[in-house]
């Protein structure tokens, strides 16, 4: 069952409108806002440089010129709150649209790109989010009211993208070897996270929201970033490969590797992370030389992803990852399997 929760956005929108006029919230009102937006608060309070207290401050001070938070995330959220107030009529129109959406229709299309027997039971929390257009967290989704709802199809594509992440995460959580690797606080953890991010975002982009990699189908700022990625594609793939090489060194520093991963997996402009683009290009290449079923199997067998991609890349003339690095990634899983058996 897939449902939509719009209460958080409704309550926060009313709060932002009142606050922008200089009306300080009563304690009871603040608690109502926080309770209705608990999912949003829990997601962001785990990010570096963001706390529950700083989120509350941003909600209350977003419209004050002197409020300049150091965190780029808080800065983006404040900008989003200001935009929501300015575009209040569009926000209300988006809410009205969302009241008429039938979420279960979306599920069938997403299941086609996930392993058999993937349960897709989730909640779509509508947010007012100037940093993330959409995100998946603990089996549920956030989707920003700030996005342009051009059509039902466009909205369904955005939700499908995040819902695919929910299904993907279901299998990650049931893979004890991968779970162990993802909690090592080591270079190996970063290597596995990087490969997993390329696969997860690549599948969601290519299969569920393909318009996100077409310049003519996206807003101007997004199209500009997409164009720059296309022009620098080989350099970006080289950065991805260098991250693997760095993370796979025996003496790899976890913090340094993590920072390099964030540079590829997060876009602080809130537009399009590099890893999303590279992953989509990888799945596109694989789709030309491998059956869809084989690509979907990588969700449960992550170690097969890079070898399978390299096979297709060699045939199509795309970027090929260093075979020795690809083999090292495979060996990580084999070594962990022996250790855990």
Q: Can you annotate each of these PLM segments?
A:
Residues 1-36, 171-245, 315-320:
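Post-HExxH zinc-binding segment in Zn-dependent metallohydrolases
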């Amino acid at each position: 069952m897939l449902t939509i929760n719009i209460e958080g956005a409704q309550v926060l929108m009313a709060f932002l409108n009142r606050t922008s006029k200089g009306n300080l919230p009563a304690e009871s009102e603040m608690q109502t806002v926080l309770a209705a937006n608990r999912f949003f608060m829990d997601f962001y309070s785990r990010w570096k440089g963001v706390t529950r207290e700083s989120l509350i401050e941003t909600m209350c001070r977003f419209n004050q010129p002197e409020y300049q938070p150091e965190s780029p995330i808080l800065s983006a959220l404040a900008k989003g709150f200001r935009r929501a107030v300015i575009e209040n009529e569009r926000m209300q129109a988006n809410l009205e649209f969302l009241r008429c959406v039938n979420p279960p229709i979306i599920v069938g299309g997403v299941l086609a790109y996930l392993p058999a027997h993937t349960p897709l039971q989730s909640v779509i929390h509508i947010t007012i989010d100037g940093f993330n257009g959409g995100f998946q967290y603990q089996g549920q989704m956030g989707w920003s009211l700030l996005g342009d709802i051009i059509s039902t199809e466009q909205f369904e594509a955005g939700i499908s993208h995040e819902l695919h992440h929910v299904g993907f995460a279901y299998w990650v959580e049931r893979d004890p070897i991968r779970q162990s690797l993802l909690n090592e606080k080591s270079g190996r953890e970063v290597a596995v996270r990087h490969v997993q991010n390329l696969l997860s975002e690549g599948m969601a982009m290519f299969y569920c929201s393909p318009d996100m990699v077409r310049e003519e189908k996206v807003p101007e700022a997004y199209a500009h970033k997409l164009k720059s990625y296309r022009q620098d594609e080989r350099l970006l793939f080289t950065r991805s490969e260098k991250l693997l090489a760095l993370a796979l060194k025996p003496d790899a520093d976890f913090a340094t590797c993590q920072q390099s991963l964030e540079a590829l997996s997060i876009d602080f402009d809130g537009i399009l992370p590099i890893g999303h683009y590279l992953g989509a290009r990888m799945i596109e290449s694989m789709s030309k030389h491998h059956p869809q079923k084989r690509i979907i199997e990588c969700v449960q067998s992550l170690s097969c992803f890079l070898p399978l991609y390299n096979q297709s890349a060699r045939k199509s003339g795309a970027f090929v990852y260093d075979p020795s690095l690809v083999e090292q990634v495979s060996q990580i899983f084999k070594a962990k399997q022996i250790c855990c058996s």
